[in-house]
Design a protein with these regions (language model features):
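Catalytic nucleophile-loop/oxyanion-hole region of alpha/beta-hydrolase
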Residues: 68-93
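Short, surface-exposed "cap/lid" segments of acyl-processing enzymes
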Residues: 2-71
Length: 276
């Protein structure tokens, strides 16, 4: 079984980290698939390892993308990282790609999607190589709901501080509308109408205040109604934000297995990094 102890880890930059559990090619000589993993804002390496190893034991290598809350508060600051990520995927990877984004990590992916959608000639190969998306506890909703989400991320244990932060965020958004609200709306639209019309696996819960079930269901219905996409959705009644793997690992693993089979990436040869 592949674990973090036998991965070759390459820090490509401050924000990009490659865990190579297996050789670059599979037995057939084809390029090995890579998972692009965008974790939640306060995730640690230990947290990330739980998700990386989900894919390591299934034959994938994993590219982790580390973001910052500042990228959400001022979208223009996220553009260099989005460009770095898109350039790396286009120029430095050759095989199939699966994107697994969590919480605010999905926001950073939305910025990257917007860049890719605006530059189809530059990122042309990605359209055929991105095979599927896993959306886990993504922060989604209205501007009011996003402000509430920021307050919970910053002050998870103080309701009074959350209220102050939420109000400050709304004032901030009103004062910086052209630089924040307008880009947010574009990012949301691009996720709804992604250039990658792939199957999607969505994890969320009824009691998650950051990933509102009504907003998530609206997006899922849009994908199905407008694009006839294959969507698998699992909503728990009671499971903390970005903790569904811990809440119900059996169901999480089963649905992930089914999803990878659906996108044709379920029988990847395992050659652990000790053979590199």
């Amino acid at each position: 079984m592949a674990t973090r102890t036998n991965a070759t880890v390459t820090h490509l930059s401050k924000h990009l980290e490659l865990h190579q559990y297996h050789p670059d090619t599979i037995d057939s000589g084809e390029p090995r698939p890579t998972v692009v993993f965008l974790p939640w804002m306060n995730a640690t390496q230990a947290h990330a390892n739980h998700y990386r190893e989900l894919y390591a034991v299934r034959g994938f290598n994993v590219l982790t993308v580390w973001g910052s809350l500042s990228y959400f508060l001022w979208p223009q600051w996220a553009m260099p990282l989005a460009t770095e990520l898109a350039d790396y995927l286009e120029m430095q990877t050759r095989g199939p790609l699966v994107v697994h984004s969590m919480s605010v990590g999905a926001y950073l992916y939305a910025v990257t999607l917007t860049l890719i959608a605006d530059n189809p000639d530059k990122y042309g190969s990605l359209g055929s190589r991105v095979k599927g998306h896993v959306y886990d506890s993504i922060v989604i909703g209205t501007l009011e709901e996003m402000a509430r989400g920021v307050s919970i991320i910053v002050a998870p244990k103080s309701a009074m501080l959350q209220q102050a932060i939420r109000r400050s965020c709304l004032l901030y958004f009103a004062a910086t509308k052209q630089h924040t609200v307008v880009p947010y709306n574009r990012f949301i639209d691009v996720v709804h109408n992604s250039p990658f019309k792939t199957p999607k696996l969505c994890f969320h819960s009824y009691n998650d205040v950051l990933c509102l079930p009504e907003a998530m269901e609206r997006m899922i219905h849009h994908w199905k109604d407008e694009y006839d996409l294959d969507i698998t959705s699992k909503m728990w009644q009671n499971s903390p934000h970005a903790s569904h793997l811990r809440t119900d690992p059996q169901t999480y693993n089963r649905l992930l297995n089914d999803f990878l089979k659906k996108v044709g990436l379920d029988n990847i040869s395992l050659q652990l990094s000790s053979k590199l």
